[in-house]
Amino acid sequence: MNIILNKYILVNLAASFLILLTVYILQYFFNMAPCDMCIKERYPYYIIGILAVINIFIDSHQILKTLIIKLLFIATSFFGFLYSIYHVGIERKFWTGRTECSGQNTALDIEALSAQLMNTPIIRCDEATLLFNLISIAELNVVAMTLLLILNAFVLYKKI
């Protein structure tokens, strides 16, 4: 495996690991409970980490497999970027989110209201969890996903 490709894979793996480690530390040590969307924003990092580990074991001379892995890196980064933008838009009230995540009431009777309350997550997706009273975790995720997307697109473009 060439050195640049190896570093590229390790950057993806390290970024995924560090971001997941950070959110779990925030969740379990600083009691910053994630909303439903925050939990789903972690999925691309799991996938990128798994792809990086798989890529470590693929011979870099297998061009088709390496290309497929690179495209999967880009697709996963792009999905994570779009989902993070969607979440930030909900937090900043640019648009409304799903009713089960934003606390909107759609119940018409007492039984439906009771069922909705029992199924509503405690943490609302439309309320930003701010770090240092400045930037939300979802906004930081947009930055992280943007950087990973740029890295993955650059590596594919340069055919490394």
Language model features: what each stretch is:
Residues N119-I160:
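A hydrophobic membrane-anchoring alpha-helix module
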Residues R92-I135:
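Extracytosolic (periplasmic/ER-lumenal) interhelical loops and adjacent juxtamembrane/interface segments
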Residues N2-A14, H61-F81, I150:
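Interfacial segments of alpha-helical transmembrane regions
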Residues T22-Q27, F79-F94, E111:
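C-terminal TM-helix exit segments that contain a strictly Trp-centered aromatic cap at the helix terminus
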